Amino acid sequence: DTPLAVISERPQILFNYFRQQFAQVTNPAIDPIREELVMSLTEYIGRVGSGILTPDESNCKMVRLPQPVLTNTQLDILCNIRYKGFNTTKLPILFDIEKGESGLSSALDELCKQAENSVDEGVNYIILSDRDIDSQHAAIPSLLAVSAVHHYLISVGKRVQTALIVESGEIREVMHAALLLGYGASAINPYMTFAVINDLVAKHKIQEEYATAEKNYIKAVDKGLKKIMSKMGISTIRSYRGAKIFESIGLSEGLLKKYFGTETSTIGGIGLRDIAREYTSLNKDAFSEAHSEGELLPNNGLFSYRKDGIDHAWNPEAIANLQIATRLGSYKKYKEWAEIVDKKEKPIFLRDFMSFKKAAVPTPLDEVEPVESIVKHFVTGAMSFGALSIEAHEALALAMNKLGTRSNTGEGGEDNKRYHTSVDGVSLS
């Protein structure tokens, strides 16, 4: 219920401009809990080989990963691997903040060229890293960097000859990991997250050893990735990598075509200029002298409402009016709630930019379909009986029967007695 990234007044990371796509069915394509047996996050990364039809030893220069999240130790081992045929290089994903859009554009072009040259030199593990940021050099969005390199190497026919590993402080949430993998990353290293976990353990804010806390974080990300993959019926991470099963909201067609391998832009939006400006703003804030050592980061109210934080559609005023309206059956309070929802002070959703265009001359009511007939076209959303609970299921059935329309919920499980039960003459079945 927070503003879309493209209309937010605050600087946004690039991850926030994407939404997951999913199979729109009443039952999950795969149940990631009960059907976990058919799912796998095991990945083999490295050089596939130049000719898969004539296999040779070059096809075997790969590393098996049980999951795509690498710890700092695992990444260090990969960086210093000394076996014949295993070569690693680290490419910085930074741009000069003084140059703005041109600096970001040239940095991306140079990054792609460096990646191609590395492949030509026999490097089969390319690590894209933003560890070296400073007050003059901001991080290129990790998603933009990996997608740009991924699609560039595809265009020159060299993508399968190397693995792309992202070492970034941006990665925190499961969605971030899913996006990076979905746009071509072979593995990821969220070093900043591990640093935060280490700090929490050192300050005894987490009552467990660092190794256990680190393992728990990786386990949480793994379960989250399986849940995201299951929404599209994908059972292995190897099928998910590079699949780009996301929708961008607020990015321009030019940006998507050049760096993300698609021209589909629902509403258009920002390009490199705005991305450079937002990441420059975030970088300057990070290196601002106004911050003292040990100062807590501000809570901007992303996940829960805060007075001076990010705007929320479901703010305390809206929730209070809705609760009062339902508890008291007050139509006045309902109208107040509807006013808050329909006429926000600042836009949050795309629909907030739209309004009804009133006709110059009202159409007589006797020339249009009556209200009683219109409501019969409505149906409820499809949810299972178990997900709704008996109380909600009966309330929906009663309401739909009163209106003369249809309830699309149930999926079995109703008590047979309901077929013979009614409330005020209205059936509960």
Task: Map each language-model feature to its residues.
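Conserved, mostly hydrophobic/aromatic
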Residues: 130, 149, 180, 236, ...
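Glycine-rich beta-to-alpha transition loops that act as phosphate-gripper elements at the mouths
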Residues: 162-174, 411
